[in-house]
């Protein structure tokens, strides 16, 4: 597994009014890993993801693949970094495949190539049967899978420098598609050396698919470790205020969290 730092962020702080959202966060995101951002509501997970993606600014320093954030041209960075937000608003009556093809805008591809790449990722995300449906007619879960196909399309020609950020990508999905989405993310990390950052609420999903867990609490980074080190009853009580039992999965090598 690569130890290349795809993102380096130091002394990241964000304040809204009198409220501190993030407080002096230092974090590196590595190629070849799935990093899960965890914590209760309001902990700062989505804000940190937006800072790491460059969507919002903060104090501190940021670099992608060793190059300071300020030196990246937006069009060039878009070839290497894609983000799936919690909600993607689109009111125009595009057909589904056209939405996915929007991900190819930063790429220098022919119309035929764009169509082929879009359909490839629609098949991966199990949404190809809706290719000719109008976007507004899709269900919430179908839209979420469609936008996942769009951001995967965006990274199609990113080579060995790619970052995928997913903000609660399983929130509208059924059980099978939750696991399919995270299997895709893990495959990108382990097979294509993508740096994957995913915001999740389900600790058991995070334990199964993440290489590394970063926990936030009241805007502070309180844990950065592999699942077996990160998950214990004391820490879950500290971060979530909830009593739990942590035990090994009966057949697979990851910890499970059981409420008590």
Curated annotation (Swiss-Prot):
This is Hemin import ATP-binding protein HmuV. Its EC number is 7.6.2.-. Keywords: ATP-binding, Cell inner membrane, Cell membrane, Membrane, Nucleotide-binding, Translocase, Transport. GO terms for cellular component: plasma membrane. It is an enzyme of class 7 (translocase). Pfam families: ABC_tran. Belongs to the ABC transporter superfamily. Heme (hemin) importer (TC 3.A.1.14.5) family. The keyword Transferase does not apply. The keyword Amino-acid biosynthesis does not apply. It is a peripheral membrane protein. Residues 7-243 form the ABC transporter domain. ATP binds at residues 39-46. InterPro entries: AAA+_ATPase, ABC_transporter-like_ATP-bd, P-loop_NTPase. GO terms for molecular function: ATP binding; ATP hydrolysis activity. The lineage of its organism: Bacteria, Pseudomonadati, Pseudomonadota, Gammaproteobacteria, Vibrionales. The complex is composed of two ATP-binding proteins (HmuV), two transmembrane proteins (HmuU) and a solute-binding protein (HmuT). Its main location: membrane. Part of the ABC transporter complex HmuTUV involved in hemin import. Responsible for energy coupling to the transport system.
